[in-house]
Regions:
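Long extracytoplasmic/lumenal interhelical loops at the membrane interface
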Residues: 271-306, 329
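Helix-boundary and loop/linker segments of multi-pass membrane transporters
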Residues: 33-37, 169-174, 284-287, 329-330
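Hydrophobic alpha-helical transmembrane segments of multi-pass inner membrane proteins, especially
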Residues: 44-60, 65-259, 297-358, 382-386, ...
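N-terminal membrane topogenic signal
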Residues: 31-47
């Protein structure tokens, strides 16, 4: 007698094994041409132009100081390596990164960067340059972890804003993103870098703004951040003296205002069309930080007002592209991340130029993509790569609140990438 169990009726269910998809797909030559959106292409082109222009200006601005040290191409070579590595990484992120992983990677990137920054600021591993203990020496290279704290803050705030939009309607819901921002600012402030603290506050403000936080809350957050940063500026003698000199009209031309004065003289010497690339006078030890925070003055001197206008025009165009990416998407992660990238890159660029022309006190922030500094360039290119990827392949994140956004893809029955 056959005792086998009866076979079920209907079509049998076949379960196929599901392979885990890697974070980054294999890079091939066709994949490098996969960036097809107009916004991502425009953003990549602007970034590569600014990076290439920055290499030329770093070579010019650093040639005198590097030449006295024995190698006129040393700063240029270091910047060139960072540019090649960073541009390759940017293209890899833009074309092959699975953006669904970005919210998952965000806490890892953020807390790792903050941890390394704390080690830099509080232990002998850190190296002090110009009064800021913000660098770790790795052989012949110096790494600035605070630049990667900016990248981590962009990602972790975007992840929070995308998952819990409804919670931002209450005061308790504001505490986590404020805590993330305060943690980043506090870790960097321990290294005495007020300029980076200002940019981190700007990034946080950009995230709240693009996440539709109410205007009174934005005003409260902005006012609180301003008060805190002013208090921070009083904790260092040189910062206090620079702020006081600027607020009093900067009359100490040979002392506290020397750097600002030399920058303005460089711009005046450049006039409308400049003295020609390589022909700057100010870089001959008149202007401190000529290849870094004050490279804008060398650009104005060598390429004139027209060259500086083209540079600022590129950043305005970048702002337009990032704003398009942020406002044309229904994905909350992309919206918040693009808004914070705009606040970081474009806001920092105009803050740098404001210092150069004397309308803001000297607080030390580099010109994105242009100033010498490998860590800054790598972080800038990494965030642009993320924005290019998100412009083409937005992340869709399910919210955990009871508030349903009818414009959200999940509300219309679309697939949700992360649950």
């Amino acid at each position: 007698m056959d005792t086998a169990p009866p076979r079920p009726q209907g079509n049998p269910v076949v379960r196929l094994p599901v392979a885990r998809r890697p974070i980054v797909q294999r890079i091939t030559l066709p994949s490098l041409a996969a960036v097809g959106g107009a916004d991502s292409l425009a953003l990549g082109a602007l970034t590569l132009f600014l990076t290439g222009f920055g290499l030329v200006m770093v070579l010019s601005a650093s040639s005198v100081e590097s030449g006295v040290a024995g190698d006129p191409f040393s700063s240029f070579a270091t910047q060139g390596v960072a540019a090649l590595v960073g541009a390759g990484g940017m293209l890899a992120i833009a074309t092959r990164l699975r953006t669904a992983w970005l919210p998952r990677l965000a806490p890892i990137v953020f807390f790792s960067a903050v941890a390394v920054q704390l080690l830099t600021a509080l232990t002998p591993l850190g190296t002090s340059i110009g009064g800021n203990q913000n660098w770790i020496r790795l052989g012949a290279l110096s790494v600035q972890p605070s630049e990667f704290v900016k990248l981590g803050l962009v990602l972790v705030l975007a992840a929070f804003f995308s998952r819990r939009p409804g919670e931002l309607l209450g005061v308790r819901g504001m505490l986590p993103p404020v805590a993330f921002t305060a943690t980043a600012i506090g870790a960097v402030y321990l290294g005495h870098d007020l300029g980076t603290c200002l940019i981190l506050a700007l990034i946080g403000f950009g995230g709240f703004l693009m996440s539709n936080v109410r205007l009174p809350v934005l005003v409260l957050l902005g006012g609180s951040a301003t008060v805190v940063l002013l208090l921070f500026s009083q904790g260092n003698g040189s910062r206090t003296s620079r702020l006081a000199a600027w607020s009093n009209g900067c009359t100490d031309l040979l002392g506290t205002c020397w750097q600002t004065t030399q920058a303005q003289w460089a711009l005046a010497n450049g006039g409308l069309t400049g003295v020609g690339i390589g022909n700057s006078v100010s870089k001959w030890f008149w202007l401190p930080e000529a290849d870094n925070d004050f490279i804008g003055a060398i650009i104005g001197e060598e390429t004139g007002l027209l060259g500086l206008a083209v540079l600022l025009g590129c950043f305005v165009a970048m702002a337009v592209v990032l704003l398009r990416i942020s406002t044309r998407t229904q994905d909350r992660f992309t919206r918040a991340a693009a808004g914070m990238a705009l606040a970081w890159l474009v806001g920092q660029a105009f803050a740098n130029i404001a210092v150069v022309v004397g309308v803001a006190p000297v607080f030390g922030v580099p010109l994105p993509f242009v100033s010498a500094g490998g860590s800054s360039l790598l972080a800038n290119l990494a965030v642009v790569g993320c924005m290019m990827a998100l412009a083409d392949r937005p992340v869709t994140v399910a919210t955990t609140t009871s508030i349903v956004d009818p414009d959200h893809p999940a509300a219309r029955g679309r697939a949700v990438g992360i649950r």
